[in-house]
Amino acid sequence: MTKKLHIKTWGCQMNEYDSSKMADLLDATHSYQLTDVAEEADVLLLNTCSIREKAQEKVFHQLGRWKLLKEKNPDLIIGVGGCVASQEGEHIRQRAHYVDIIFGPQTLHRLPEMINSVRGDRSPVVDISFPEIEKFDRLPEPRAEGPTAFVSIMEGCNKYCTYCVVPYTRGEEVSRPSDDILFEIAQLAAQGVREVNLLGQNVNAWRGENYDGSTGSFADLLRLVAAIDGIDRIRFTTSHPIEFTDDIIEVYRDTPELVSFLHLPVQSGSDRILNLMGRTHTALEYKAIIRKLRAARPDIQISSDFIVGFPGETTEDFEKTMKLIADVNFDMSYSFIFSARPGTPAADMVDDVPEEEKKQRLYILQERINQQAMAWSRRMLGTTQRILVEGTSRKSIMELSGRTENNRVVNFEGTPDMIGKFVDVEITDVYPNSLRGKVVRTEDEMGLRVAETPESVIARTRKENDLGVGYYQP
């Protein structure tokens, strides 16, 4: 009988990536097949996020639902992973004794052994250690699930912003070797992936070992990824302004595979608040980065993160944030009301901004960002945009859907053979959360780089010398 696995994932793209790796790993080692129905599963895994308010209570609420399933099926294995697991550890079992496995983001590769241990003597397993790069060495080969894919290139963060739990839950920065990253992306490209999104809590801080033992920069890595045949788009998430160096900006100038869209969190437009947050940059320094980026890539669009109502934030501080939003003309944002994360320095600060004031500031900020986003969308009306077709539209199974370089969803009429390929679409309608268009050019008409194999290169360039010995000229 087929054994089934159910994974519930909360949080960032890194968590989504981790969950996909858990599924691949347990399929390879235990032949577990994913199911969307928790009641069908032999193993339930909750991959948690500690960023949002009341994250811990949300976890225990979900576990309470799963407890009922365990009462019906005592052999059911329940595991809790992710950042809340890393933060709470054994405390989770003190409140939910029926949980069998607690694992951190850096120990998910040990899940097969943990499951075997629980199956063997029914004793619970807690492993929230930080074994650095070992996680990536133990994961199975990647499996593409469409034309886009996430690839983790580093873990952790050394910045220790005063509001953030990431350094405590995912550890300090650890970069994967460049060869490992490039090999994973090449494997994905061979499976039809056209766009990769490089992931890291502080992705542009990547410093990886090259094949010759030297240390490569993030800019070096971007150029190497762009050289992989079949990869036509590169995104990366999430960046820190302090690591956004001029050599990265130069990649935007000369590497068309790098999309004209960047998510670069700033959090506040007030230098005083940025200092309290431990951000180590000013609003002016942030704007200088954007100015240089737009000089290198004039059509680039910028999104950001914002926290409103940080302890000590005055009306003047908030107005400086609003001015920064107008000056940069952000295209979109992820914006939140400050809520203290246990164990962070900000949790010890006096939370002196009234809740209603926080809500009002968030509303004002989001309305302004939405207005700017709609203005950006309207500028696209009548233009031709290159779309990577991801599949059928959520709005209608009779239409296809894909994304522009600047991350806009576009719905249009097309044929199934377009899925996984690029099409050029003329934008005909603009809506708050999507665009609509009509196909004006297919990939066959674009002259994009065709996939090459070593064998095809040799066959095409093979020559013979005077002795009849074959050789090829790269």
UniProtKB/Swiss-Prot annotation:
**SMART domains in alphabetical order:** Elp3
Q: Which positions in this protein are listed as binding [4Fe-4S] cluster 1?
A: 12, 49, 83
Task: Report keywords, A-Z.
Answer: 4Fe-4S, Cytoplasm, Iron, Iron-sulfur, Metal-binding, S-adenosyl-L-methionine, Transferase, tRNA processing
Source taxon at top rank: Bacteria
Q: What is its main location?
A: cytoplasm
The residue ranges of the TRAM domain are 378-441
Query: What are the Radical SAM core domain coordinates in residue numbering?
Result: 143-375
Domain MTTase N-terminal intervals:
3-120
Where does this protein hold [4Fe-4S] cluster 2?
157, 161, 164
A Pfam family recorded for this sequence: TRAM
Task: Please give the positions of the paired cysteines in each disulfide bond.
Answer: none
Which top class of enzyme applies to this chain? transferase
How the protein assembles, per its UniProt entry? Monomer.
Q: What name appears for this protein in its UniProt entry? A: tRNA-2-methylthio-N(6)-dimethylallyladenosine synthase
Q: What is the lineage of its organism?
A: Bacteria, Pseudomonadati, Pseudomonadota, Gammaproteobacteria, Enterobacterales
State which gene encodes it.
miaB
